[in-house]
Amino acid sequence: MRKTTIIAMILGILFPGCKQTPDVVPDEKKFYNHSQFSMGADLSYVNQIIDKGGIYLDSGQTKDPYVIFREYGANTIRFRLWHTPSWTKTVYNPPAANMYNDFSDVKKGILAARSQGMAVCLDFHYSDTWADPGKQVPPAAWNGLTVTLLRDSIYNYTLKTLDKLEAAGAMPEYVQAGNEINPGFVLPQGDRWSKTSDFVFLINGAIKAIRDASASSSIKPKIIIHIAQPENVYAWFEGLAAKGLNDYDIIGFSYYYMWSGIALGNISNHVSLLKNTFNKDVMIMETTYPWTTGNADNYNNIIDESKLIAGYPATREGQYKYMHDLTAEIAAGGGTGIFAWEPAWITSQARDLWGTGSSWDCNTFFDFSGNTIKGIRFMTDKYEIAE
């Protein structure tokens, strides 16, 4: 106990009528359990960044990024999984020794997160590359399959993946059946709008595999259906229950303010509407905000100063305020989690399809030297979250 605290206690006893003003501000940090509220981060690039020379620091000291995120309050780490991303090797010259975001790489990340006591969200893209609202291309191995054979492939791939993770002690606590599947997934067969019955048939194959894999595991993954942007979510889910899409646990959505028509201050209303209408938990699976308009390398950043919110400058304080206020909005609406997307995608010699380095270094929780910045601290703030 601090000496100042002891003195204050003695004065309080001797002069009980005096109002006490503590000299030391109490520690306001709060660490949450993922079952209460997921304080999440997508760290899918981290293994590749480390392999390609990236260094993470905290207070000037080199540190394992998984340790950093755990110490700053993260309780759930998200990883994307591609089927056969051979391009992640051939994008290098000479080709890299191994693929990234394939099963082996993802298992490595899951075990690293698990070693720090964090839960995991596994994001099946059901593609060899990025799957999002603009592109949902099935793996090359599944080309030309009938809808029935495609469902079998989805089921067997999902089941086999989770069974292998279970055997490795890496069963995830959360599993996404697809990534930002606004148009559907594994197109054209799995089109949400023009082939709704086939879409439900296919995604239920993924869901059944997740349930079957969890039957013999002590970890029962919660199933997430993930849509991009809150304004799209209600219409997307409306009517699907009657079509047979019911067996999932969480509605997840991406919230990128620069591409959304929904103001930050209205997020709680959307979360509450979805939660009460569909009787599911609700999470934000992806979000971000810049701490600078600068660039650490020659890879052009995706977000610039023209895409800022009034009252949230592209500064360390502005990024922190955005993450804090958005988390408070989710909690106020009864939501159960938030994930920052790739907040550790610092510059390095890592390559993707478009460049070397990072097109996201202005949005990370690290400065251009790799040191943690204030934005990462939002996870241990106190929020009105049900115990």
Residues of each region from the PLM?
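Conserved, mostly hydrophobic/aromatic
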Residues: A41, F69, D123, V175, ...
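Glycoside hydrolase catalytic-domain groove-lining segments
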Residues: K63-Y66, D212, S216-K222, E231-K307, ...
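Active-site cleft segment of glycoside hydrolase catalytic domains centered on the general acid/base Glu
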Residues: N101-D105, D132-A241, N246, G261-N269, ...
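Bacterial Sec-dependent N-terminal signal peptides
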Residues: R2, F15-F31
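Aromatic-lined substrate-binding rim segments of carbohydrate-active enzymes
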Residues: Q61-A141, K195-P221, L264-T277
